[in-house]
Amino acid sequence: QVVLELGGKSPCIIDKTANIEVTAKRLAWGKTLNSGQTCIAPDYILIHKDVKEAFVKAFAAEVRALHGEDIAADRHYVRMVNDKAFERVTGYFKDGDIIYGGRCDAATRFIEPTLIENVALDSTLMTEEIFGPVFPIITLDDNGKSFKDKVIDFVVSREKPLAFYYFGKESEGWEIIRRTSSGGGCINDVIMHIANENAPFGGVGNSGMGRYHDKDSFEAFSHTRTIVSTGTWID
C-alpha cells in the first residue's frame, strides 16, 4: 500500500451563526501554531459579510492575547523555518490588501499573523499552500445563492483539502461536510481532529491517500499475502 499525506489549502468557513469570540480565539491559536507551518493549518477563510468586521477585530485581539502587544518580542512565537520560506510567505503580501498584521523581519525570519482581503482567486495566495501565518479572507453573502451554497460551490471547485473547518451552527456544518470532500476536519474547532490517536487521519485526492493512526496504521503498513498449500495424497 501507499500512504501519502500531501497537505493542501484547508478552508475555514465562518458563518453568521458562529460565536465570533470563540472562533477568533481558536483560529488565532490554529493559525499561529508553529506560525502556520503545519500540514493541517487553516489556510484561507470564507466568511459571511455580516460578521467579517467583528471577526477581524476579535482575531487581532486574540493574537495579542496569545503573543502580547509586541509579537516580535515573544520568544515562543515561531519564525519561518528558513530564508526561502520567509521570502515565499512575505511574497504573498502583494496579492491583496493587508487589513491586519503585515510586519516582518528578514533577519529573524519573523512574520506577524496577517489577514489579507481583496485577493484574486487565481493569485498564488489562493492557489498555493501558504504554510505560514498569512490568512486570506474572502467575504460571501446570501445574495442570489445562500452563503452555504456559495461555500460548497467554492470548495468543490478546487482540489480536495487535507482538512476542512466550519464555525457556526452545527447542523449547517454537517450538511456542508456531507456535500464536500476532505481528508478530515472539525466543526467549531481547528487542528484537533489529528489529536485522537484512535481516529484515522489522512488526505484525499491531491491532499493524500491512505489512512494512519491506531488500527489504520497497522493495516496500512502491513503486508498481507495469500498462500495455498495443496495436499498430494490424491490427484
Regions found by a protein language model. Give the residues of each.
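Conserved C-terminal structural/oligomerization subdomain of aldehyde/semialdehyde dehydrogenase
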Residues: 13, 111-235
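ALDH superfamily catalytic-core signature
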Residues: 1-121, 142-146, 187
